[in-house]
Amino acid sequence: MPAPLLLLLTVLLGAPLSTRADNLIVLLDAGSCPNCTLADADLVCADLSDANLNAADLRRANLSRARLDGADLRNADLRFSNLKGASLRGSDLRGAWLDGTDLRQADLSGALINPGALDRSHWLGAMGINQGLRSPASLHNAGVDEANAGRWPQAERLFGEAIQADPEQAMSWVARGLSRGQQGDEAKAAQDLLHAADLLDRQGAPKQSDHIRQTVAKL
């Protein structure tokens, strides 16, 4: 059986008889389905390159390892969808809802994305993300995730990127200092922590600053 027909059969057997199933037929037959309801659809490894999915409802859809290169996903609802390992090279995600979206290991090279749209998604390990698309807060939070997993070099790198994006965030300096301390680099850890203390003094938080200085004195 040809691969496209096999994919269509697999998808339809797993879908209820509903508008969603009709939309799956349209999508897999025509390669496009703007404004379609495709919530919870199973589209693992589907080839949807250049598909028009403008304003499609793809909530919780499983698009892991799908090919969406050049796809029009403007204003699509991708909340809590699975795009892990998907190829989204050159896709248009402007206006797309990405809250809770799993973009880990996805390729976003050349993708068009609104600034801040990735803040509530899971993008760690994604490729091709333009530097300005990740806010200082999202970089810091990703660093916290890596630190909680005990991956200190990765945590240090992400906290460093958060600092580059916003050098006035004292907590990112603290976090990078702690990450460096966990790796045995006490000299650099002390530098980061003392810089954080200086920032906190200037920002009107002397108690926090004093606590950090006391910590450094014990290193």
Question: For the regions a protein language model found, what residue spans apply to each?
Answer:
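Tandem repeat scaffolds
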Residues: T19-A175, S179-L199, P206-K207
